[in-house]
């Protein structure tokens, strides 16, 4: 019986039952797992918990000073466009320009580790960013937003648009049944794509569908190089980043998924088009590719009651762009691609209707629409250049500060800039300049007011440097008059000349003060070196005199205002005074400056030139029975040092130039006659035909006259240089490089030995020169003007050379408003040059893991002028307002109690003309070049600036305005300047007294704000 039971229990039936039971359990288990997997694929419960926990560790914190733990992204389109990937280079460039990091983000260790592993930084990203420039108070001066037009939320997107997008790219993304759904993966689509991929490996011809969700596509478009996925690993990193970004706010992803749709529509890349550049986002694409109004189009698509024909056009435009993102450059720019895009659009219209996304009525209407893609973006209303000169100057400075190459790139940076400009004052000045061009303004006695160009710059001296408060002109073009012009302002050059004169007196004082009078009287002095002779005599007669006292005495030296003497310097000139009643007077330097009388300053410049001529290397003046006797010491040091230095300088000017550039360089700054001598000296073999071609469009008769009168044969290199208006060695270098365009610097120096010796021999041979030909420039005079130029450059003179003429004292060498302003800033700062600032603070990438704030470091001033000279010149400028040519400015600005604020100013008027004389000595041509009027000023101890008016070209003949015009504008700006003075947001100045030492500790704010 037991055996029977045993046999029964071991029967095949029992074994089969066990197998069935086990299989059933396994099937149920697998079914359960499948159900769980399906539920997880849809609801993402486990994924939500995991990724939320991981995302919670990805934290950032903004801390003071540079960060010791920060990560920057790769070179994806989004990161490069907004400047995130270029931030390290921009921060380095800014630090080299005097900025320091005051705050920067610190990322958590998990955040850093994730980025180091190749995942893009996880944070709530911006769809729109761009450059924003604020004034000193936070008001917006300039804003650039990229993309220009974006959807703010899903509610602002027409349902037809986002439903179409989801049908094309990610149909289950907004399924409301699964609030925790992982937006980074669509499991059914992934399974379908995986199956198709496996079949393709087995030889199937079926195409493999894409499995990317909108979230992973966003990661690719924003953070992968060139917006492309290059490997399976990169795709997995994109999915990981999309998942972490999806769960940043918690396990519920409903709002995140809605935002993904909006972000995608705002970020879809749509190639680039002329007149706009890179196109990103559906709304911008609609405007630039179809010329549509996005707001109107979106309202049309959101309304079911709108005419079907109009909705069909709008819908087809949207659909084409949603399809074009797959290959935008091909589908939007190439003719074959546009044909393909039309085919794809028609195909998808039919599919969308079959699936019920659009009505058959809309489908049929859209199929009949023929769209035309533009080849250039439509024009947009532009802001007048004249209204944004201050902001444009800031943008130009930002290029230098950040090292960014173009304004196109800079305007897309996620950057907010706080500037020193005052928007209210900018607008008030701009409005005033606009009113001045209205004929009803009646500020001109004659001439068309609409053709007058005005420019105003106002700066403030503060503890943190010299701040630009106003920078405005009325030129409706990118050209910036204050920074880019080169104008002859007339008598404002007397300001630079006066400073140079006082510097010479100071140099002589510092070298000779304290020496015995007998020694001072015994010093050999050239008979016409009047400044040296006077200074030594004054020191001998006044032992122990202070520097400020001798400077005041120098201001009292008398100079004749007579126009009758022969006064030449570098060229022949006839000088005259503006007021002929001055012709018979002798004026002190002070009065000549205050009243702006020309002839005394011509003589002052003559004395300055003579002072430097006596001190040129290799030359000495000796008194040998004639007061102007000159001998030249032609020793080897002159040949080796001075000559080499000049050759090197001229080589740098012409280096690497072939024949064309050399001749074009010769054109600059020369009259037609001088250019003829230069051309024939450099190209002696050139015939009349080549000469005529170079001098077109002159008449044939004039060309022949110039050619015949400029024959260099038989003339020395010195004579040819003088006739060409250039240093003989420069003329020689130009000729040598014309023949040997690839010569090295040392080759030129070696080849120049003979000509350098020739010049020295000429100096020695002419120790007792006969009356010189006035056409021939003096070599020592030219070299003296080089020394004067160095002195002017140290104080901010902007150009590469001075015209070697005494007329430089009255404006013939030109100037620039910004640089005149800088000179007055040096005077107001007691001789110390401080940096001029427009940008105070940079705020990169606010609200991102790259956020960085920078402020300009405290400025370091450079003493370029003694405080004693600065004080003397300021006093003279004040006298110009109280009793001189700037009298109209008196009382232009008043303090709170109604009393006039101290103002100092120097005026200038330029009536600049081209005059040509015939062989009979009579003027054969006289035409206007331009007319200018300017005033450079300071107000109290804080504010200073320049106001300029000018008319260029032949039209200048129809105007007769003088410096009274900018002075009148200064008075009209009185209320604006008074408001600036009472603004309490500025930093305190460096000195309690307007003319005090700037090195002392800063005074109280109230003291600094009470101009004396």
Task: Give each language-model segment a name.
Residues 2-141:
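N-terminal type II signal-anchor transmembrane helix
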Residues 89, 125-131, 136-138, 147-149, ...:
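Extracytoplasmic
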Residues 18-25, 32-48, 52, 56-67, ...:
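Non-catalytic, structured segments within soluble enzyme domains
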Residues 104-122, 178-202, 282, 363-385, ...:
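Acidic helix-start/capping segments at beta-turn-to-alpha-helix junctions
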Residues 160-171, 352, 429, 489-513, ...:
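Active-site SXXK
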Residues 181-190, 277-287, 354-373, 445-459, ...:
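Acidic/histidine-enriched alpha-helical segments
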Residues 489-585, 724-741, 834-852:
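Short, glycine/proline-biased beta-turn/loop segments that scaffold the active-site neighborhood
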Residues 419-448, 458, 468-483, 497, ...:
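A penicillin-recognizing enzyme superfamily signal
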